[in-house]
Amino acid sequence: MSKAFKKLALASLLSTAALGAQAAALDLSGWSPLTLTFPGGQPAGNWALEPGNTAVTQTVNADPSFYLNNLNQTSYTIQGSWQVLTASDDDYMGFVFGYQNSSNFYLFDWKQASQGYVGTNAAEGMTIKKFQGATGNGLVDLSLADFWENEVNFGDMSVLATNHSSTAGWADNVLYDFLLDFNLTPGVMRVVVKQGETTLWETTINDSTFTAGQFGFYNNSQERVRYAGFEQEGGVIVDPNPVPEPASLALLGLGLAGLAATRRRTSFAS
């Protein structure tokens, strides 16, 4: 294990202990925006961070757009509030988790009203999806249709759970609460969406494709979506480039030594 990773892991443990005592709203200033701007689509997202760094609003009608926390982590609970601050549109808002790269991740999205677009249909309501692209580049592997469809598997997108109905859409200017338990039990995720004290949806997903990754905010073709007051408990940082343990290094050394000896014997024979 590298010294840098040990320091990162220690910082994570100290942060977890502090959160256990009193969770504070996350500082979003270190998060990063990303938009998949497809040909013929809409502009890039504009994520406007508010003073205090605990709230951010995506202000424009954009192609699929993310605001990522840059932490490859597992075994955490995160929760906070979000809402649409306009009555001028009816599209997608939600969250991304287990994010590996721009074509491999889990997605929770919520559509206000049913609508067809780019040859696919979006039903009114909430959906949890999984995206698995071959190259890791969303602009190569995915399409606007992959993001829009929410009833059946499409392209590199698989539907994991749905809460669709004619009354399941989000409402304008209404505050909602989101909670995610991610991999507290290996291979298990739990999502809870509430409006005040009313639980609108609670679902558990069993899937171990991505057991660590980044968390972030997401919306698609929806302006004026505000996310605020998110808090996290737990969280274990996972080193994306682990250094081989000593035993592995020893085996690697023996293998290289054997290869060198073979080459010497071959040279002598010739």
Predicted regions and their residues:
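Extracellular glycan-recognition regions
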Residues: 24-242
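Positively charged n-region of N-terminal signal peptides that target proteins for export
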Residues: 1-7, 245, 263-265
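C-terminal membrane-anchoring or membrane-association module
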Residues: 260-270
